[in-house]
Amino acid sequence: MNKYLEYPEVESKETPPQKLVVLLHGIGSDGHDLIGLVPYIKNDLQNCHFISPHGIEDYDMMPYGRQWFSLRDRSPHIIATLIANNISKLEDIIREKQTELNLTNKDTVIIGFSQGTMIGLYLTLVQQAPFFCTIGFAGALIPPMKINNKLTPICLIHGALDQVIDVSEMYNASNYLSKLNIEHSVHKLTSLAHSIDGRGLEIAINFINTCHNMV
């Protein structure tokens, strides 16, 4: 039983599932937000079980919503410390579902949006065993103190008109990943602000299927 909050999930069309897809929402939202993407992608990912956990903390700047970590202080070193302190709680949620489905990291896809991308990328880089792949929409990279995993392929997708997290953050992340020789791709989407659109979902689906073909 999840000791944090019961979250929405969608079972795979095929049984048993071969992949676990973990959807990580942005700040001030909750798991019900990104689970709404599943109807648009599940037909192309029929062997995937989808979960969309709620952020592990109450959103501390509004009386509703959830967060993975506070953004009251946006200093990079403060954010890195907060993520490091909270990351094990997210890992617990994922491990619990992996155990239930008899899956492991190599069968797990991480998809984040905004703050969910921040914690998703951090989570990916600190794993002892690599995830299948990681996809980040409209986010930024907060590097951990220690990199344990350089093997998970990463796809970054960002709107060119994003005024919440500037698209330059995608290129900052790309430069960092390149220095570590981590396989990744970047996609700047024209006429898109801080959001996910059909183009981004198509890129994500193709990326997951490409990674599958490489295994």
From Swiss-Prot:
Keyword Hydrolase: yes
SUPFAM superfamilies per the UniProt record, alphabetical: alpha/beta-Hydrolases
Active-site positions on this chain: S114 (charge relay system), D162 (charge relay system), H194 (charge relay system)
InterPro entries per the UniProt record, alphabetical: AB_hydrolase_fold, LYPA1-2/EST-like, PLipase/COase/thioEstase
Gene Ontology molecular function terms on file: hydrolase activity
Domain of life (superkingdom): Bacteria
Keywords, ordered alphabetically: Hydrolase
The keyword Lyase is annotated on this UniProt entry: no
Pfam families attached to this UniProt entry: Abhydrolase_2 (PF02230)
Transmembrane domains' residue ranges: none
EC number: 3.1.-.-
Protein family according to the UniProt entry: Belongs to the AB hydrolase superfamily. AB hydrolase 2 family.
Annotated PANTHER family: LYSOPHOSPHOLIPASE-LIKE PROTEIN 1, LYSOPHOSPHOLIPASE-RELATED
Protein name: Uncharacterized hydrolase RT0729
Lineage: Bacteria, Pseudomonadati, Pseudomonadota, Alphaproteobacteria, Rickettsiales
